[in-house]
Amino acid sequence: MKVEIGKIVNTHGIKGEIKVKSNSDFTETRFQPGELVIIERKNKEPLEFTIASYRMHKGLHMLTFEGINNINDIEYLKGETIMQERDHEEIELGEHEFYYSDIIGCTVFDDDDTPIGRVTEIFETGANDVWVVKGDKEYLIPYIADVVKDIDVEGRRIQITPMEGLLD
C-alpha cells in the first residue's frame, strides 16, 4: 500500500531541486538518498524516482532525484503528490503513537457524535502534534489526552472532547 508523504510546491535553483511540503512522519528516513518515491500525476501514469539528495531549507524539504540535473526536467511536476510504499511503518511506536498516514483522512467527532471534519494535515509543535481538521470550517486540534479521547484507525474515526473555544 502506498502512502502520501508530501507535495511538490516548487522548484529551487536551476539544477533540478524541488521544494516539498511534507505531510508525513519519519521524514529523515523517507527522504534519504536511495529511497524510492512515486509521483502521482493527475490523469497520467505515476512516475518513480530515486532520491539523490535531501536537505532542509526554510522549513521545506529539498530533494533532487537521480538523473534529474535541470529545472526543465522537473518543473512539470509542481503541485503533484509524492507517495511511497508503506514499508517504513515497520518502525515500532509507543503507546498512543500513530503514523501520520493512519490519522490523516480520519473523521473527527465531538462528544455528541457530531462530525467535525476530516484530518487533512499534522503539524509538529514540539510539545504535541496539532491536527488540521477541515469540515464546515478549519479547526486546529491539539493531540493531547484532554482533547483526543479515542482513535479507531481501522474505522477511520477519532472521538474528541473539545476544550472551551476550540470549535468556535
Swiss-Prot record:
<dbReference type="Pfam" id="PF24986">
    <property type="entry name" value="PRC_RimM"/>
</dbReference>
<keyword id="KW-0963">Cytoplasm</keyword>
<dbReference type="InterPro" id="IPR009000">
    <property type="entry name" value="Transl_B-barrel_sf"/>
</dbReference>
<keyword id="KW-0143">Chaperone</keyword>
<dbReference type="GO" id="GO:0005840">
    <property type="term" value="C:ribosome"/>
</dbReference>
<dbReference type="InterPro" id="IPR056792">
    <property type="entry name" value="PRC_RimM"/>
</dbReference>
<dbReference type="InterPro" id="IPR011961">
    <property type="entry name" value="RimM"/>
</dbReference>
<dbReference type="InterPro" id="IPR036976">
    <property type="entry name" value="RimM_N_sf"/>
</dbReference>
<dbReference type="InterPro" id="IPR011033">
    <property type="entry name" value="PRC_barrel-like_sf"/>
</dbReference>
<dbReference type="InterPro" id="IPR002676">
    <property type="entry name" value="RimM_N"/>
</dbReference>
<dbReference type="GO" id="GO:0006364">
    <property type="term" value="P:rRNA processing"/>
</dbReference>
<protein>
    <recommendedName>
        <fullName>Ribosome maturation factor RimM</fullName>
    </recommendedName>
</protein>
<keyword id="KW-0690">Ribosome biogenesis</keyword>
<dbReference type="GO" id="GO:0005737">
    <property type="term" value="C:cytoplasm"/>
</dbReference>
<comment type="subunit">
    <text>Binds ribosomal protein uS19.</text>
</comment>
<comment type="similarity">
    <text>Belongs to the RimM family.</text>
</comment>
<dbReference type="Pfam" id="PF01782">
    <property type="entry name" value="RimM"/>
</dbReference>
<dbReference type="GO" id="GO:0043022">
    <property type="term" value="F:ribosome binding"/>
</dbReference>
<keyword id="KW-0698">rRNA processing</keyword>
<feature type="domain" description="PRC barrel">
    <location>
        <begin position="95"/>
        <end position="166"/>
    </location>
</feature>
<dbReference type="GO" id="GO:0042274">
    <property type="term" value="P:ribosomal small subunit biogenesis"/>
</dbReference>
<comment type="function">
    <text>An accessory protein needed during the final step in the assembly of 30S ribosomal subunit, possibly for assembly of the head region. Essential for efficient processing of 16S rRNA. May be needed both before and after RbfA during the maturation of 16S rRNA. It has affinity for free ribosomal 30S subunits but not for 70S ribosomes.</text>
</comment>
